[in-house]
Amino acid sequence: MKMKILYISPENTVGTLTLWKKEHESRGNECRTVTFFASPKNFKEDICLELPFNFTMPGLAKLRNIFYKRYRGREGYFKIKEGNPPIWEPEGWLDKTFLKFKDWLWRPIVEKAIDDYQLYDFDVVHFESGMDFLKNEFFVKELKAREKKIICHYHGEDLRSRGVMPYIDTVADLNLTNEVDLLEKHPKLEYIFLPFETSSFTPKDKLNDIIRVAHAPTNRFYKGSDLIISVCSKLESEKLVEFDLIENVSHADALERKAKSDIFIDQIGDKGGWGYGMNSVESLSMGICTLTQINETYNTFIPHHPFTHVTKNTLDTELRRLINNREKILTSGQNGKKWVEINHDIKNVSNKLYDYYSSIGLLC
């Protein structure tokens, strides 16, 4: 039976919306994706509303953080919110007033999109970030009244800094995440691996004459980039490596540069979530030796992972060890390619999603 599947998301952040649309359609279903803002990495859009006040933009994000320091202290917006799950609410009169104004501004654009694309007619609606168009959650309420299936997919700040939206959390048929640390933040959260077309890349079979190390942060604070840059720059000054800091470029350019590396470093620390994300999924798919910090809980969750574990105290030593063992770099990359195909390939991840669909009563 053909299903109509809708995704609603602030942005097509790492390209997964495009991937899911393609996969659902390959299974004979209809799929549309609606984003509030255009992708900062130029991923393909389906329905993009181009709404004002995009707080993922650096300038507005910085302004928001300064504002939240008034209520949350020195850490501002990045302060971890308490609760299981933490629940969103406006923080003070000014926040409440601004959000009412923003919703007033957004509502006619949203309502037009609902009518133009018949968004109430879908069988299942995925809310990436677990968030309705507006803070009054009018769209979710109408979906519930029409007995549509509602799925929330939480990422990073959604639970760490913001919290669940009060109404959607009570009516969601399924809550999903790709991030292991978030499982501790919500009692009804299920895990699913981040999907990727792992077959898009041929794994490398030889290394550069001088080992090339890459790091590609979207947020230096979250990735522990200052330390990574410092260590790699020191090794580069010793002429042991070539260091490529990939940032503020298109996704296509980032992939091209990443593919030329021999070692990829994802993150140090747990400030922006545990372990790894799409950056590592891409590098593993390229057959690149990938370094990141994997804490004990994550190590238990994925015990046979291919990552080289590093911390702020071991990064320099680990890099020097790898530089002197080129065969280890190649072997690690080959093992990573096999692992990522099993766990992250879109075909395998979609099978898991369709199992979840069946569990909530959708006829797949």
Where do the model's predicted regions map?
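Short N-terminal targeting/anchoring amphipathic segment
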Residues: 4-9, 98-104, 114-135
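Conserved donor-binding/catalytic core segment of Leloir-type glycosyltransferases
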Residues: 6, 203-223, 229
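Active-site proximal beta-strand in glycosyltransferases
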Residues: 124-130, 140-159, 174-177
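Donor nucleotide-sugar binding/catalytic pocket of nucleotide-sugar-dependent glycosyltransferases
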Residues: 151, 158-159, 169-203
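Nucleotide-sugar-dependent
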Residues: 267-278, 292-306
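Short hydrophobic beta-strand element within catalytic cores of glycosyltransferases
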Residues: 283-292
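A charged, aromatic-enriched C-terminal amphipathic alpha-helix characteristic of glycosyltransferases
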Residues: 327-358
